[in-house]
């Protein structure tokens, strides 16, 4: 095989994925791929693709070293931890944290009514008891002191398995937060008539609805099989959930977990579906599969899909709507965490 040119772009710090030791690391360009490389004295060297600059079908993703957006640090108003051991061990948030909270994620349960093969929260199975209403109130009060008026996403697990979810939503609304959103797989929203309206009346604004593909073939490898009543399939229930939310006045954002070779060829079709389901559906959020929570052991070898891959796939699949210049680094989080578009 021909040798691949190697270029060290810059140095940074990272963690050993096994023991979480802080390590010196470097971003390296190898051919058309950008890798984050680090070596743990105990567990060896790790290298992971984080960006692809390849040209394919006249679609060229942005160069890695040009993908940045300078930001002025915005520190938390009330840090929760002191600086003792350095990043990330003091995080909680500490006084050195250079970004205030834009959206606070509050986990209200680790229970779930699905058992997805890929789950960022590793939810379901043997899980601890739900946090009490008093604990949730304490978390919301802490979040309000650190970043008053920020948006809040109630997450899990599956938040709708809690029968007191409307009370939790009211609790958050009473504390003056901005947008209130629930992260959901949509089962209860689609199957229980009137449930979406209950959440709306409690003060909910939006539902962050899991939806990986416009067809079952692209969903089942990520979600597994689900026992549903009346001969319904998973996508039929999700469509009902969108209808119920729209009728109740709740906005919906479709959220897709994308894995290479599973549903990466369906992103354009998913965008077309999101537009078709508007104005109830107001956005599409695409999350590349990640190596945390619950994931298959072969993830490193084949399923990884980078941000640049997402941008390139969208431009190839819906060229009439999207071009590479439509994508920009985010305004809140680190440039390598996400992108935004029109």
Positions of predicted regions on the chain:
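Short glycine-enriched, charge-decorated loop/helix-capping segments at active-site entrances
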Residues: 122-130, 221-232, 300
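Short recognition patches in nucleic-acid-associated and regulatory proteins
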Residues: 15, 20-31
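Conserved alpha-helical substructure of the radical SAM core
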Residues: 32-47, 51-53, 61-63, 68-184, ...
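Flexible glycine/acidic-rich beta-alpha junction loops that bind and position SAM and/or redox cofactors
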Residues: 217-223, 261, 281-309, 322-342
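Radical SAM/AdoMet-radical enzyme domain recognition
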Residues: 137-153, 162-288
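Short, flexible, mixed-charge glycine/proline-rich loop motifs
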Residues: 3-11, 29-33, 109
């Amino acid at each position: 095989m021909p040798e691949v040119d190697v270029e060290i772009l810059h140095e940074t710090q990272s963690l050993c994925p096994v023991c979480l030791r802080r390590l010196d690391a470097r971003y390296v360009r190898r051919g058309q791929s950008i890798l984050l490389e680090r070596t743990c004295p105990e567990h060896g060297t790790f290298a992971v693709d984080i960006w692809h600059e390849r040209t394919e079908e006249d679609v060229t993703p942005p160069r890695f070293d040009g993908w940045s957006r300078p930001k002025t640090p915005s520190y938390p108003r009330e840090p929760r931890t002191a600086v003792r051991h350095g990043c990330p061990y003091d995080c909680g948030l500490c006084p050195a944290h250079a970004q205030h909270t834009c959206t606070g994620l509050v986990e209200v349960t680790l229970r779930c009514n699905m058992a997805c093969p890929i789950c960022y929260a590793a939810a379901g199975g043997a899980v601890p008891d739900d946090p009490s209403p008093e604990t949730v109130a304490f978390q919301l009060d802490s979040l309000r002191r650190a970043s008053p008026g920020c948006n809040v996403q109630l997450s899990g697990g599956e938040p709708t398995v809690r029968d007191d979810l409307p009370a939790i939503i009211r609790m958050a609304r009473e504390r003056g937060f901005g947008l209130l959103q629930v992260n959901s797989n949509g089962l209860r929203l689609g199957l229980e008539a009137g449930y979406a309206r209950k959440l709306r009346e409690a003060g909910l604004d939006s539902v962050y609805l899991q939806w990986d593909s416009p067809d079952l073939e692209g969903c089942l490898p990520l979600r597994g099989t689900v026992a549903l009543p009346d001969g319904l399939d998973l996508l039929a229930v999700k469509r009902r959930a969108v209808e119920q939310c729209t009728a109740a006045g709740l906005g919906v954002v479709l959220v897709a977990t994308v894995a290479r070779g599973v549903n990466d060829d369906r992103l354009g079709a998913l965008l077309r579906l999101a537009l078709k389901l508007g104005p109830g559906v107001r956005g599409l959020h695409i999350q590349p599969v990640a190596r945390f929570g619950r994931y298959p052991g072969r993830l490193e070898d084949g399923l990884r899909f980078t941000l640049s891959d997402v941008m390139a796939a969208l431009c190839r699949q819906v060229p009439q709507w999207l071009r590479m210049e439509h994508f920009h680094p985010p305004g809140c989080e680190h440039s390598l965490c996400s992108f935004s578009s029109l």
